[in-house]
């Protein structure tokens, strides 16, 4: 396993389109739910243990060799918000382009052909991790970090939060990320039916409201 490949995949500069998404943080800021670093930490922790766990498990399952198309259907079933389903597929399409250019793989090619409009991002992330020679825990860690890192970066722009404080939030959440990655990888090894379906209804509702706004900084 290449540790450097893990850093490349988890790097926020990997051109997979994540910079355009706040992971629900913009809607939370607008609703007054995130006002400072403490609020951000609680928001990210809640996101980690719900949608983060689900996404991490889907990514780990792709590395375990489960059918990507079945995983894509499982991701659809676990994403009740139409806006978030659409965003996940658009992010998956962008991730697919970046991954195929970085780590060419027949598995990535096959999924791209089967889902020309994009597969769910966590599934593509898992196949990218597999192509990079990474394991299920690695893919789960990438997904978990992304779950918290996206909102943390967005809130720096949305609130003018000190970047040092945002980074400290991520550091404090490291034990949660490790826990989520371990749980996700363990579930992935048991099969698709064992994958968690944790959800966050408020995030789903906020995503639909956010998508209907005419003026917004982030797509989600």
Which residues does each predicted region cover?
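A ubiquitous short alpha-helical element
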Residues: 8-11, 43-45, 79-83, 110-113, ...
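C-terminal auxiliary extensions adjacent to catalytic cores
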Residues: 33, 37-42, 131, 140-220
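Internal, conserved structured core segments that host functional sites
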Residues: 56, 61, 65-134
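A generic local secondary-structure boundary/capping motif
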Residues: 48, 84, 204-207
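Generic structural signal for hydrophobic core residues of well-folded globular domains
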Residues: 27-32, 47, 51, 62-66, ...
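Glycine/small-residue-rich interface belts in oligomeric ring/scaffold proteins
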Residues: 2, 6-69
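Conserved active-site and cofactor/substrate-binding residues in soluble primary-metabolism enzymes
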Residues: 15-23, 35-39, 50-57, 86, ...
């Amino acid at each position: 396993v290449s540790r450097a490949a893990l850093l490349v995949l988890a790097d926020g500069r990997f051109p997979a389109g994540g910079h355009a998404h706040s992971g629900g943080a913009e809607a939370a800021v607008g609703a007054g739910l995130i006002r400072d670093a403490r609020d951000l930490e609680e928001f990210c922790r809640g996101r980690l243990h719900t949608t983060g766990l689900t996404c991490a498990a889907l990514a780990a399952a792709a590395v375990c060799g489960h059918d990507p198309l079945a995983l894509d259907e499982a991701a659809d079933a676990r994403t009740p918000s139409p806006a978030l389903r659409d965003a996940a597929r658009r992010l998956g399409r962008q991730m697919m382009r970046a991954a195929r250019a970085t780590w060419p793989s027949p598995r990535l090619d096959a999924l791209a052909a089967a889902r020309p409009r994009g597969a769910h991002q966590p599934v593509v992330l898992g196949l990218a991790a597999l192509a990079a020679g990474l394991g299920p825990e690695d893919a789960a860690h990438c997904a978990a970090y992304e779950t918290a890192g996206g909102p943390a970066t967005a809130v720096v722009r949305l609130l003018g939060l000190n970047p040092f404080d945002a980074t400290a939030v991520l550091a404090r959440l490291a034990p949660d990320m490790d826990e989520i990655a371990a749980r996700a990888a363990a579930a992935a090894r048991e099969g698709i039916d064992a994958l968690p379906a944790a959800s966050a209804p408020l995030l789903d509702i906020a995503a639909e409201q956010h998508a209907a706004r005419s003026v917004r900084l982030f797509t989600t």
